[in-house]
Amino acid sequence: MSDLLKQVQKELKEHTTTDAKAAALKFVPNAEKVYGIRTPVLNVLAKKYKEGGFDLVKELWDSGAFEEKLLAAKLLNVICKKDPLFSLKLVAAFSKDISNWAVCDAVGMQSLKPVAQKIQKEIFDLSAKLIKSRNLWERRLSLVIIEVFTKDPSLHPEIMKRVKMLEDDEEYYVKKAVVWIKRNFEKGR
């Protein structure tokens, strides 16, 4: 464990509140190892620790606490322009260890957003791989990582193809992602 990770963990503990912990456990029932930290604090920490780079992203993810994984996703968002394809590889690796909707959505919607247009093909390739997974969180992620592209009408047929592949999925959180993408189309987002 690096000194930088210890410093981040110390700061996370300093920002812990019982209200935030109760809220996280209420809204993310299967969250594990919850500190109890509000999202705005994580956003500030992501910017503060960007110099930790990809090494800190990996360390945070591997530490395994709920907010550490969220912070890893947010930090990746801040630094992904340094190496978009490596950032995508991290998202692919992280996909195997996702265990709740909040981390899934943070990884899928935030980690690659600044480089999504630049690596669009590669993101769709990863989506195509994840959609076939037995892991429900990888299937959900297969839609969440392409949500950013719902604003582009030229990509709607490709996105709808994926939505249709998961329309009959048995898993609640996969169904929620399907509904979410369809709603984006209906609202023109």
Located regions from the model:
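Alpha-helical scaffold domains
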Residues: 1-189
